């Protein structure tokens, strides 16, 4: 089905008098806005805002991709992710739409995939269910396909969701996961292309890439390769920044690996207080080669215990991470050893 070819004839889309300006491949152009019946649209499963929710669903269901041949079943799944990812923002957006209607037009592809406006679409679905009245989503329709225009679509999505039209920011972890997927894993975009799309500097994005790689390494360390949802509740973005800063100053690769393993172990256990401040104290140790050597020697037995506990787990979950983190022997070992290193 092509919305532009079938929609006007079959009367499930209607052209409005409104237009929306988009910049695609450096060309700025005003595009017509249409009112599209909700049942002809489907969510974008490549939306970075829900990337960790997608990875969790795939892991739990042992699948590589969510099947969207049954559009309504697929939409119900993603609807839940969008709602749970930021329920407060959802409530505010829905109240606003109910009061004054949809103000900002979204962007969809000709096959019905939503590129911009997933939250607004979700709110309209809720309103339709609540009022039992057919609702329409207002959006530009681009005659593009995800198969043949993937890079252009991703750059447009980033520009709309991170740039001028952004209303609610990404969670920091979702942003890192998106960067890892788009730049490191699939190599869909270069650092320069990503930076341009979100109006940021290449230097900042390069640092984000390194943090994203460290996040992926952390998941490998806990035997949960690419299970990014496990990092959602650990609040690792700022601690990863501190770890990246430490590693830049160390030349010896073996020392780098030992430090990463020690810090990754403490990401799980959170021995005391705020994790970012705690990691900064480790950074103070790392600034002195002698103190760092002593610290890593102290940490080794406890790191090995963490690894042993991880090896005993068949499938890692948030609950299992919590249980390992609360292991009395491990937690006390870290809390005793690290303050000793601070005072040397």
What residues fall within each predicted segment?
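Short, charged/polar connector segments at secondary-structure boundaries
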Residues: 1-135
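Tandem CBS (Cystathionine beta-synthase) repeat/Bateman regulatory domains
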Residues: 23, 170, 180-181, 186, ...
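Exposed alpha-helical structural elements
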Residues: 73-77, 92, 154-155, 239-242, ...
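Amphipathic, charge-rich alpha-helical segments that serve as recognition/docking helices
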Residues: 81-82, 129, 134-219
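Short active-site loop/helix that positions an aromatic residue
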Residues: 119-135, 265-270, 283-290
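Amphipathic alpha-helical "recognition" segments
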Residues: 132-137, 176, 201-273
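Extended, amphipathic alpha-helical scaffolds
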Residues: 278-344
């Amino acid at each position: 089905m092509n919305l532009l070819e079938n929609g006007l004839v079959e009367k499930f889309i209607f052209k409005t008098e409104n237009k929306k300006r988009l910049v695609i491949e450096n060309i700025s152009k005003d595009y017509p806005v249409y009112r599209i019946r909700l049942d002809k649209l489907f969510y974008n499963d490549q939306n970075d805002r829900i990337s960790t929710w997608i990875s969790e669903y795939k892991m739990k269901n042992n699948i590589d991709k969510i099947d969207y041949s049954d559009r309504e079943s697929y939409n119900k799944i993603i609807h839940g992710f969008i709602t749970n990812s930021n329920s407060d923002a959802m409530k505010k957006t829905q109240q606003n739409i109910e009061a004054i209607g949809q103000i900002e037009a979204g962007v969809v592809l000709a096959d019905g995939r939503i590129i911009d406006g997933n939250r607004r679409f979700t709110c309209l679905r809720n309103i339709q269910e609540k009022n039992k009245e057919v609702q329409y989503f207002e959006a530009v329709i681009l005659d593009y396909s995800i198969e043949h225009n993937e890079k252009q679509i991703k750059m447009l999505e980033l520009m709309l969701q991170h740039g001028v039209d952004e209303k609610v920011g990404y969670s920091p972890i979702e942003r890192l996961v998106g960067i890892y997927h788009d730049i490191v894993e699939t190599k869909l975009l270069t650092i320069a292309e990503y930076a341009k799309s979100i109006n940021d500097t290449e230097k900042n994005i390069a640092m984000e890439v390194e943090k994203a790689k460290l996040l992926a390494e952390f998941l490998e360390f806990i035997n949960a390769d690419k299970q990014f949802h496990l990092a959602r509740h650990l609040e690792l973005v700022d601690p990863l920044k501190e770890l990246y800063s430490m590693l830049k100053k160390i030349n010896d690769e073996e020392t780098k690996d030992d430090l990463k393993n020690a810090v990754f172990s403490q990401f799980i256990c959170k021995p005391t207080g705020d994790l970012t401040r705690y990691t900064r104290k480790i950074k103070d140790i790392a600034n002195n080669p002698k103190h760092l050597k002593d610290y890593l020697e102290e940490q080794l037995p406890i790191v090995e215990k963490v690894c042993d506990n991880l090896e005993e787990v068949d499938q890692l979950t948030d609950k299992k991470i919590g249980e390992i983190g609360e292991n009395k022997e491990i937690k006390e070992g870290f809390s005793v050893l690290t303050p000793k290193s601070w005072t040397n």
